[in-house]
């Protein structure tokens, strides 16, 4: 009889645990959350995602252990510093044209306890931020603790307009005299990893879960790394991208004239200059990968790995010589599409999901995992339904924009890019043309099928504009695409 009662009691306890609302879960049962955020890392700059030139063995191990979202995007930017908009959206959950852009607006968000870290803290999480912040509010206000907060980018004026063909290049990515990432005596990526490792060691034995916001400046320029990493990528062995151009013919219409990022390499672009920049890009990515490896080793050593959800992503991508561009202020996939990986307890290993998402979906996803309240005005979506194998019910398309110079919508394997200043429209079939080399609206390619797809994507873009608070009037600029 005693055995029967014991069995019934255990069954009742298990049923109670299953039916318990997420918000009432005990701290010990909720996962800790580790965000690994890169800067300027395109989806096509990771070995596990198809780039055979770059070595990213530690990042690759994460992709093998978790679920990859293959079509993850950033929504765009309201000025040249795309990272500011991306990180503001990430930390507030607001869409691009609704997000707080000014210090008073961000202070109001803080007062309303709407920041990502504040929501997790309210749910009992310990929060720490290290590395790049780039929001116009002191991160010490919104995290329990901050360490080595960095500015938007390491400053180094010697990196611009180089290399010049036929002339010696006086700049060296591994020489500390040029400052940048070397300012302070130790490479910033190593310092950020040191901070994360120290926090993890301090977390051993503590019952409250943590939210560790680890934001690397790398691989943002100046792309500096130690000599041994630079030596892995001799410039003359680095492949020139298949979509290389000396210049993009629409650069002025895109709002890119005299933009800082576009002055990193000489105009017109040369294969040699692009090889040099891409070699330095790969070197700092591999150095970043080594720092991520140190953090992962610490998770394993401390035993924290078994109850930690890891998200690896980037604030946006980067052109680095593709389409004649160097920066990220454009709507091509190399600049708006980023890697996105989530792994940890309960997450399927080795799975790939091709449903379109925004990187800022990380916020509501982790809040739901933590049993924390999701603010009602969050515009992004939890990925848990997709992770649980449910089919998407709402988002079928992605939109993007840059100031009032560019707009984009992608759906059904196609992408429509608009440059309203010159009434330019470009259409790409991403399934057949992933490098976006063949504009289907050019006179030689245009046909009724392509025109119909343009009109369909234009209607989708108008719908997403309304949803995301984008007030740019496109209908008057493109009456031929507008619905009747």
Which residue stretches match the model-derived regions?
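Positively charged n-region of N-terminal signal peptides that target proteins for export
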Residues: 1-5
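Bacterial N-terminal signal peptides
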Residues: 7-21
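Formylglycine-dependent sulfatase
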Residues: 25-420, 424-425, 434-459, 473-484
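Charged substrate-recognition surface patches at the periphery of nucleic-acid/ligand-binding domains
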Residues: 429
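Sequence context surrounding c-type heme c attachment/ligation sites in exported
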Residues: 462
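C-terminal "closing" transmembrane helix and its immediate cytosolic amphipathic cap
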Residues: 466-471
């Amino acid at each position: 009889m005693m055995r029967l009662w014991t069995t019934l009691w255990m069954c009742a306890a298990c049923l109670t645990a299953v039916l318990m609302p997420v918000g009432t879960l005990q701290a010990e049962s909720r996962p800790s959350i580790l965000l690994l955020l890169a800067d300027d890392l395109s989806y096509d700059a990771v070995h596990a995602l198809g780039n055979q030139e770059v070595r990213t063995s530690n990042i690759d191990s994460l992709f093998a252990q978790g679920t990859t979202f293959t079509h993850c995007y950033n929504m765009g930017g309201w000025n040249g510093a795309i990272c500011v908009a991306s990180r503001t959206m990430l930390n507030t959950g607001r869409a691009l044209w609704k997000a707080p852009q000014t210090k008073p607006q961000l202070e109001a968000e803080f007062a309303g306890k709407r920041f990502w870290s504040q929501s997790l803290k309210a749910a009992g999480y310990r929060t720490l931020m290290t590395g790049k912040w780039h929001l116009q509010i002191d991160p010490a206000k919104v995290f329990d603790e901050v360490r080595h907060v960095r500015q938007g980018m390491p400053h180094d004026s010697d990196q611009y307009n180089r290399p010049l063909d036929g002339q010696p290049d006086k700049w060296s990515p591994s020489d500390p005299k040029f400052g940048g990432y070397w300012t302070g005596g130790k490479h910033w990526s190593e310092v950020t990893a040191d901070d994360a490792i120290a926090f993890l060691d301090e977390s051993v034995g503590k019952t409250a879960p943590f939210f560790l916001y680890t934001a690397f400046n790398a691989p943002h320029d100046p792309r500096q790394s130690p000599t041994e990493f630079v030596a892995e990528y001799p410039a003359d062995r680095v492949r020139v991208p298949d979509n290389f151009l000396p210049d993009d013919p629409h650069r002025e219409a895109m709002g890119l004239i005299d933009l800082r990022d576009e002055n990193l390499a000489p105009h017109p672009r040369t294969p040699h200059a692009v090889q040099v920049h891409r070699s330095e890009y790969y070197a700092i990515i591999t150095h970043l990968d080594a720092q991520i490896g140190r953090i992962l080793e610490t998770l394993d050593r401390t035993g924290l790995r078994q109850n930690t959800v890891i998200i690896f992503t980037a604030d946006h991508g980067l052109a680095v010589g593709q389409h004649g561009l160097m920066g990220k202020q454009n709507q091509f996939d190399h600049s708006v599409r980023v890697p996105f990986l989530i792994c940890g307890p309960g997450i399927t290993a080795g799975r790939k999901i091709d449903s379109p998402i925004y990187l800022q979906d990380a916020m509501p996803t982790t809040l739901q995992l933590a049993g924390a309240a999701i603010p009602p005005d969050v515009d992004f979506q939890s990925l848990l339904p997709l992770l649980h194998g449910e089919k998407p019910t709402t988002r079928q398309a992605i939109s993007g924009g840059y100031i009032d110079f560019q707009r984009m919508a992608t759906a059904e394997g196609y992408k429509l890019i608009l440059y309203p200043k010159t009434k330019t429209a470009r259409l790409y079939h991403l399934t057949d043309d992933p490098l976006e080399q063949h504009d289907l609206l050019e006179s030689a390619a245009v046909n009724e099928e392509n025109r119909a797809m343009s009109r369909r994507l234009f209607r989708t873009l108008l719908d997403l504009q309304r949803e995301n608070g984008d007030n740019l009037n496109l209908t008057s600029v493109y009456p031929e695409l507008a619905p009747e």
